[in-house]
Curated annotation (Swiss-Prot):
It holds the Pfam family BacA. This is Undecaprenyl-diphosphatase. It comes from the Bacteria. The gene is uppP. It comes from Klebsiella pneumoniae (strain 342). It is found in: Cell inner membrane. Keywords: Antibiotic resistance, Cell inner membrane, Cell membrane, Cell shape, Cell wall biogenesis/degradation, Hydrolase, Membrane, Peptidoglycan synthesis, Transmembrane, Transmembrane helix. It is an enzyme of class 3 (hydrolase). GO terms for cellular component: plasma membrane. The keyword Transferase does not apply.
Length: 273
């Protein structure tokens, strides 16, 4: 792969990663399709995908830095603006409760989960995840019990964490699973999305660092420019995608995202079967 071509591939995949990582549409499904069409597959490609996820994570940190620092008691000038109708406040305990179920299962079944990364499993995950999004919209309480993220209870955070376990199924979408779980538990669409983004930072950071450590043998200095381009593109596009997404869900439901997932599942079938 020539230098120019590899950088172009990196830029394209960085855009795809940034666009899809935090939307409930499955970044994995998109990455395997685009990677296959670009002829970029194998161990180096897998390592590349892991590294550029760090760019997406950095976008969340930049977007929610005040809230993230506030969780650990560090305030720069003023605490994060209160979001909700009650007097509660999102705390680090909420995040830890949301992490525990997936962390435990992920560590126990890490190798088994990695073996599930194939087009068939991803296709089915896209479909089931789409059905869950529709179910969340249909079955959610008419009046959310947690209007803002600061209204969330420990129980809601833990149950959302249990739903996050579904995202261990490649192609399911971590944001899709957590947002759906939040809505079914009476958390507003917007608050569930915000909590999903905040929960993503420690979850994705931990998983990515573990994957990078296990993939270190596939890294070489010649790949640094390609990885850097992918990282930067993922960061920039994810930043735009998160801002746009949070504005969009104030006006529309998740039904269009569910339909889009079904379309992507069909695309996986066409490309790989």
């Amino acid at each position: 792969m020539s230098d120019i071509h590899s950088l172009l591939v990196a830029a394209i995949l960085g855009v795809v990663e940034g666009l899809t990582e935090f939307l409930p549409v499955s970044s994995t499904g998109h990455m395997i399709i685009v990677g296959h069409l670009l002829g970029f597959e194998g161990d180096t490609a897998n390592t590349f995908e892991v590294v550029i996820q760090l760019g997406s994570i950095l976008a969340v940190v930049v977007m929610f830095w005040r809230r993230l620092f506030g969780l650990i008691g560090i305030h720069f000038g003023r605490p994060p603006e209160h979001e909700g109708k009650g007097s509660g406040r999102l705390s680090l305990i909420h995040i830890l409760l949301g992490m525990i179920p997936a962390v435990v299962l992920g560590l126990i079944f890490h190798d088994t989960i990695k073996s599930l990364f194939n087009p068939v499993n991803v296709m089915y995950a896209l479909i089931v995840g789409g059905v869950l999004l529709i179910a969340a919209e249909v079955l959610k309480p008419k009046q959310p019990r947690a209007v803002g993220i600061d209204d969330m209870t420990y129980r809601q955070a833990f149950v959302i964490g249990c739903f996050q376990c579904l995202a261990l199924w490649p192609g399911f979408s971590r944001s899709g699973a957590t947002i759906s779980g939040g809505m079914l538990m009476g958390v507003s669409r917007y608050a569930a999305s915000e909590f999903s983004f905040l929960l993503a930072v420690p979850m994705m950071m931990g998983a990515t660092v573990l994957d990078v450590y296990k993939s270190i043998g596939f890294l070489n200095m010649g790949d640094v420019p390609m990885f850097a381009v992918g990282f930067v593109m993922a960061f920039i596009v994810a930043l735009i995608a998160i801002k746009t997404f949070l504005q969009l869900i104030k006006r529309i439901s998740f039904i269009p995202f569910a339909i889009y997932r079904f379309i992507v599942a069909a695309a996986v079938y066409v490309v790989f079967f």
